[in-house]
């Protein structure tokens, strides 16, 4: 199976990617815009795309890898700053998540797991 993990450079995404690679034969594809993650968190062997989820090039990623499952962990966590950057959070968290969900529907992905500490 091909598993897409958003936020793969963050805590949740990188830990899940590492576990999948160590315990299964599934392929991990990761997306992160690196606004809060760290490159060293991304396990070796992950096909990594440094992208924002609001861009329209998700189609090419979905088509190239024939995604089976999405784990959506990407979000901009701005502890204490959220009231001051509402527009950014709206675009980066809500609209980006909506874009990902729409791509999942378009590409008939049956499993979509969303987790957030926001």
Language model segments and positions:
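N-terminal Rossmann-like NAD(P)+-binding domain of SDR-like oxidoreductases, especially those catalyzing
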Residues: 1-118
